[in-house]
Amino acid sequence: KNLQNEKKAKEYLGKIQSSSNLLLMIINQILEMARIESGTAVLQLKAEDIDALFHRVNTVFEEDIRKKNLQYHADLDVRHHYVVCDQTKLQEIMLNIISNAIKYTPEGHSIHVKVHEAVSENPSRIRYIFSCEDTGIGMSEEYLPHVYEEFSREHTTTENKVPGTGLGLSIIKSMIELMGGSIQVESRQGIGTKFTVDFSFDIASKEEVYGNQ
């Protein structure tokens, strides 16, 4: 009966598509975690332009930022712009952390994303510090020790309304460690959250990224 109503039919199809996308995401996350835990995950390293990568990451969320009227600031402050990294995994790490900030930051609030270069003890390598700080709902002191556990989510009224599996940060932490990096989180409930990731990469040249064009 309801299928005769076009609006209702579109609503049902939308729910089916959302459920299918969520299921596919869960399957992919479980497979990725299995690869990491079994030691079969490998890094696909190549020369990359960090300016271009950072721009791609930030443009992904333009529509979500507009819809929630968020004050979104993205800053890149590096001297070395070309590095050897796993582009896909580095993007996924940034996308996941920024996506969480957007999901848990109320309308009209702010998010500040930054990549800056830190001092490296190895002259052939550079350190990038990626940070994402929001004025969102934050996390309780009791939950923070469990933030990277598989299938872990804080049970609050707001948290329960946001779709997710609780696998994301667990996988992201494993990816970061696979890349030789580290991640830290600071959070206060009702005030906001800040994730900080410390990466180290081999330095590349512009020619390695773009050839002789």
Predicted regions span which residues?
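Short conserved segment of the HATPase_c
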Residues: 139-151
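Short alpha-helical segment of the dimerization/phosphotransfer core of two-component systems
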Residues: 18-23
